Design a protein with these regions (language model features):
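Short secondary-structure boundary/capping elements
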Residues: 160, 190, 365-368, 488, ...
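Short secondary-structure junctions and interdomain/linker hinges
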Residues: 26, 33, 164, 168, ...
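Catalytic cores of large soluble enzymes that bind and process phosphate-bearing ligands
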Residues: 149, 153, 252, 298, ...
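Conserved helicase motor core of SF1/SF2 NTP-dependent helicases
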Residues: 156, 205-208, 217-243, 248, ...
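Extended, charged low-complexity regulatory segments
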Residues: 1-167
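Non-catalytic, well-ordered alpha-helical scaffold segments
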Residues: 64-67, 155, 166, 217, ...
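Alpha-helical nucleic-acid-binding subdomain
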Residues: 128, 196-388, 393-405, 417-419
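P-loop NTPase Walker
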Residues: 2, 10-13, 19-22, 129-137, ...
Length: 552
């Protein structure tokens, strides 16, 4: 193939005209929506409709509706939203099954397509791939996106999703995904775009039934624009602490699960019952208790089963049996159970380790433990159809169980090399707990190849459980390692500030709060950091990295 620039094989005037028709169709639809102003059931409905219309108009004025095209026997334009007029599909929603060819077709497998066209920033700059002949014209939109300066917010990657990412985004709605991805591989992109894809493709899921959990407010601010850009602003994005309350090391210990089993068993005291003139033998009471205890339902519901079994067997009113059986199977709320579980002597009887008892009795509360107790004694409804957890390597077993209870579908994404909590399961163990095999992504899209290579070497040197990164973007800018003073640190920051818009200085006091966020350049003050924290801090850099080691 010649290295000479080739004339694009796409009619630019035709593309402009197609885009104009699509925009006209959008405006016509929005005009129709605006025409129903005042037609809601009440003032609140009117206000909501007006807000939706205004927000959509503003979005369409800012966003390029169409970002690419695939051709079979006719051109099909791909965009953020599907647009049709008079039965003609002007734009195909990127989430539609047919649009998968835009992301996954290749020269080895064209998927029945003749051509793929990507708009690189504007309709005048095209990247054209002739899938039948292997000819390419223009510059890759992916490389252009990766080379740009990083802003203070993550951008939607809908125009540049790669084949491996798209395949994970489009997994069936009922699939459980556990994704181990190294830094810069796009695991967060996969999670957020999967959320938007699920709303479009699973009629059981509305945006209000999808939950996105992130590690921190800093992370949520960073990704806050992605889902609104994809048209799904109503998906709840929050932290685990905000959802359930803070967790503690002592309250996260997996030993609690066996201890709670023993606690429940200790509450049962089968004995002979007298209900009015009727005597119920201890053996019958014990058999009913055993039958009810085997049900995977909360304590209060098992107690109802227990009393109902005895009532039916002896021709009694269930309410009378319930009153008589208060000492045999006591009613117990989650709050009452938690009060009992504050007793060190009881906890020792239940077999909790001494350090867990000491930590727990000194802790004010624990969100995940309280949720576990509430689920066992009162029940927790499945509020969401799908939960997507970022930085999921830090979930404790109790936190994972809490997320599972709230959602019928689950996507976990993270990086075991960035595990910060002692009780974090890690993604391999989380996958085993869920009964699935973890997927893995290793291509370092976001960062330079030099930074990826430095991270690989650092992880190998210190025995960090990291995905081995594959760098695809060499820049010729080596990672700088300095040994020295605060003055050198300040000089490095000043130099990078002169070249990049978004520079971070990360030290031991705030390293973990930067998890999931990215910057153009990073200066790592390694003083007081362990190797894992250095890895985390260094992996935030996209283009340049300076590591300042303390003088020995």
């Amino acid at each position: 193939m010649s290295d000479e620039p080739r004339t694009p094989t796409v009619d630019l005037d035709g593309e402009r005209a197609a885009l104009a028709r699509a925009r006209d169709a959008v405006q016509a639809k929005l005009g129709a929506l605006a025409a129903i102003e005042g037609g809601g059931a009440d003032a609140l409905a009117d206000e909501y409709i007006d807000a939706v219309v205004r927000g959509t108009i503003e979005k369409l004025q800012q966003e390029l509706v169409v970002f690419g095209r695939i051709d079979d026997d006719q051109p099909w334009r791909i965009g953020l939203y599907g647009i049709d007029r008079d039965g003609e599909q002007l734009v195909v929603d990127w989430r539609a099954p047919f649009a998968g060819g835009f992301y996954r077709a290749g020269f080895d497998d064209p998927m029945g397509l003749a051509r793929r066209v990507s708009y690189v920033g504007s309709i005048d700059d095209l990247f054209v791939e002739e899938l039948a002949t292997g000819e390419v014209t223009g510059s890759s939109p992916l490389l252009g996106e990766l080379a740009r300066s990083r802003g203070t917010e993550m951008r939607a990657a809908v125009a540049t999703l790669q084949s491996e990412q798209d395949a994970l985004v489009r997994l069936p709605p009922d699939a459980t995904l556990v994704l181990r991805g190294g830094p810069g591989t796009g695991k967060t992109v996969v999670g957020l775009h999967r959320a938007a894809w699920l709303v479009y493709n699973d009629r059981r899921l509305t945006a209000g039934r999808i939950l996105v959990l992130g590690p921190s407010d800093r992370f949520l601010r960073f990704v806050s624009a992605v889902l609104p850009t994809l048209g799904e602003a109503r998906i709840l994005q929050t932290t685990f602490d905000r959802l359930l309350g803070p967790s503690t090391a002592a309250g996260s210990d997996p030993a609690w699960l066996d201890a709670l089993d023993r606690f429940e068993a200790s509450l049962l005291a089968p004995a002979e019952l007298r209900v009015g003139l009727t005597r119920i033998r201890e053996a019958d009471v014990a058999a009913a208790a055993e039958r009810a205890s085997g049900r995977a339902i909360p304590w209060r519901d098992r107690r109802k089963v227990f009393t109902s079994v005895l009532a039916r067997a002896h021709g009694l009113a269930a309410g009378d049996v319930s009153k008589a059986a208060r000492d045999v199977w006591p009613p117990m709320s989650a709050a009452a159970a938690m009060r009992r579980l504050r007793s060190p002597s009881l906890l020792r009887t239940l077999g909790l380790p001494t350090d867990v008892i000491a930590g727990w009795t000194a802790a004010p509360a624990d969100g995940a433990l309280l949720d576990e107790v509430r689920a066992r004694f009162e029940g927790v409804p499945a509020t969401y159809g799908h939960a997507i957890v970022d930085e999921a390597q830090d979930l404790s077993l109790l936190q994972l169980r809490a997320v599972q209870r709230r959602s019928t579908g689950l996507t976990l994404v993270g990086d075991d090399a960035q595990r910060s909590g002692a009780h974090g399961l890690g993604l391999r163990r989380a996958a085993a707990q869920l009964g699935v095999a973890p997927a893995e992504m290793a291509t370092a899209y976001r960062m330079s190849a030099e930074i990826a290579d430095w991270l690989n070497a650092h992880a190998a040197r210190h025995g960090i459980d990291a995905v081995h990164l594959v760098g695809i973007r060499p820049t010729g800018v080596a990672v700088r390692e300095l040994v020295g003073s605060a003055e050198q640190h300040g000089t490095a920051i000043a130099e990078l500030d002169g070249r990049w818009a978004n520079v971070a200085s990360i030290g031991a006091d705030d390293a973990w709060s930067h998890k999931g966020v990215e910057y153009d350049a990073v200066v790592v003050d390694a003083a007081g950091m362990d190797p894992a924290a250095v890895y985390l801090a260094a992996s935030r850099a996209a283009h340049e990295l300076v590591v300042v080691h303390p003088a020995s």
